[in-house]
Design a protein with these regions (language model features):
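Active-site mouth of glycoside hydrolases
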Residues: 25-264, 269
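Extracellular glycoside hydrolase catalytic/binding regions
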Residues: 171, 178, 195-353, 358-361, ...
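Solvent-exposed segments in extracellular or luminal domains encompassing
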Residues: 454-456
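Positively charged n-region of N-terminal signal peptides that target proteins for export
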Residues: 1-4, 180
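Sec-dependent N-terminal signal peptides
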Residues: 4-13
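Aromatic- and carboxylate-lined catalytic core of secreted/periplasmic carbohydrate-active enzymes
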Residues: 22-23, 49, 289-293, 299-302, ...
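C-terminal segment of classical bacterial N-terminal signal peptides
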Residues: 13-19
Length: 469
């Protein structure tokens, strides 16, 4: 019995020690996220260190216990980023027009305490309503602002176009500034979730963003300021995407896109990696020198009528895996951020995929490398390459084991053997110093021969190659 007690105490000590060892360093916790002056396509911390935002959306948590659960899971699996909506039941500070609920501010305080403890930088989304109409408040309806409920606005367009509407939005922003504007656990402030879904003409939306983005930046000089738009799944969305993402005060170019078999664009039914990579390619096509993120992604039923049924069988998190890897290896400032934190990640216990991405890029400094994304596809593989000054990173994705093949048709992913990828043309004659290969499905690194013509070990679905020169 004494031995059992001693062993139990020892295991508890080891567990606590490991948890403490994983606590973020003081410099990370005290640093703000910035756009890097050295390479403005990537983020850095105010202490000069590179920052790659690894995480997901945790937009609508139901309780304080959920906050502890999700942030703890993220921390233990290598994440350092999360996106939270401030107009949900848990955090909405104004359920009645003109009255601030201080209890909700205390909850936000608690969220940031947890974020600080776990090393998670939080992107706060300030608004997400699409309508102002009679009734009760919902995530997409701000009924308390309607004239029938004592508010000053006839509809959402009235709010967007009027001086009173701007004043009300900035009043809300200043409440958050007073309390959180100097908090380093804040990644940044997103003005609106998918603002092109608001019930207002597009020209009014454009004018509002031109006015408000710089004003919000003045209020939050220490934090990033950005905007988001609805899923890029139809031709009509391209003009507003280009307009909003080109605005200089919009510091982070963001795109939302999902696997959606009801979407107008065929790419939304393509393999997940192709869908995600193409979304970043659209942003890169604007010639921007700012960080780019696939800020919402995943798989949905046709026309966003619910989570896609493939999540129920995706026990290995292959959708999450592709959403994480494809954007970064296509030139984004970080991995993609899945939307379905509750319907997929937590239900299927696939948090570990974030840690696998973090391990794949561990020690990589995008600011030093000046990465340029290129493709080096070969038979049976889509090969996404980041070519840097000192390092070449490549994510090699099996072309056969797609979501349709493995998850819809239930055909297991096959183990691939004898594949090679020749990176010689990408190295410009530089001498190879080291080659390592990472299998994210086994969480294993292996050394390979010091040559640019790389023979891949047997693997399933995907593998990462790192060449140092």
């Amino acid at each position: 019995m004494k031995r059992l007690i001693l062993l139990t105490c020892l295991l508890a000590f080891v567990s606590v020690t490991e948890a403490w060892a994983k606590r973020p360093g003081r410099s990370f916790r005290r640093s703000f996220v910035q756009v890097s002056a050295r390479d403005p396509r990537y983020f850095c911390l105010s202490d000069g260190q590179p920052y790659i935002p690894v995480g997901c959306n945790i937009a609508a948590m139901g309780s304080v216990a959920d906050m502890e659960h999700y942030l703890g899971k993220m921390h233990r699996n290598g994440a350092n980023f999360g996106r939270v909506w401030l107009n949900t039941n848990l955090f909405e500070i104004e359920t009645r027009y003109g009255e601030v609920d201080t209890a909700k501010l205390v909850r936000i305080d608690r969220l940031l305490e947890l974020a600080d403890r776990y090393g998670i930088k939080i992107k706060f989304c300030i608004e997400s309503f699409r309508h102002i109409r009679p009734g009760v408040n919902k995530w997409d309806t701000k009924a308390s602002y309607h004239t029938s409920n004592g508010g000053p606005f006839a509809d959402a367009d009235d709010y967007i176009t009027s001086q009173r509407g701007e004043e009300e939005f900035l009043r809300r922003v200043r409440i958050f500034r007073e309390r959180y504007g100097d908090h380093p656990a804040v990644f940044g402030w997103e003005l609106w979730n998918e603002m092109n879904a608001v019930e207002t003409p597009e020209e009014h939306l454009r004018a509002w963003n031109v006015r408000m983005l710089p004003r919000v930046k003045e209020i939050f000089p220490k934090n990033l300021v950005m905007q988001s738009l609805g899923s890029l799944d139809r031709e009509s969305s391209f003009p507003i995407y280009e307009f909003i993402n080109r605005l200089p005060p919009n510091e982070v170019a963001q795109v939302h896109r999902y696997i959606d078999e009801g979407a107008e664009l065929a790419v939304c039914g393509a393999p997940v990696d192709s869908m995600a990579s193409d979304a970043i390619a659209v942003l890169r096509g604007y010639g921007l020198r700012k960080p780019m993120l696939l800020a919402e992604s995943g798989a949905v039923k046709p026309v966003h009528t619910g989570p896609h049924p493939i999540y129920k069988v995706d026990t290995m998190g292959s959708v999450l895996h592709d959403v994480l890897f494809a954007p970064f290896f296509s030139g984004a400032a970080g991995p993609g951020h899945l939307w379905h934190w509750d319907h997929h990640i937590d239900k299927q216990h696939t948090w570990f995929q974030m840690g696998r991405f973090a391990r794949a890029v561990e020690g990589v400094d995008p600011l030093r490398e000046g990465f340029e994304p290129v493709r080096r596809d070969t038979a049976g593989l889509r090969v996404y390459v980041l070519r840097g000054e000192h390092t070449l990173l490549a994510w090699c994705r099996d072309t056969v084991s797609t979501w349709r093949h493995e998850l819809s048709e239930r055909i297991p992913a096959q183990r691939l053997s004898g594949l090679q990828v020749d990176f010689t043309p990408l190295l410009g004659g530089r001498r190879v110093k080291k080659v390592r290969i990472y299998d994210p499905w086994r969480d294993e690194w292996v050394r390979a021969s010091r040559r640019a013509d790389v023979s891949l070990p047997d693997f399933t679905r995907s593998v990462v190659v790192r060449i140092e020169y």
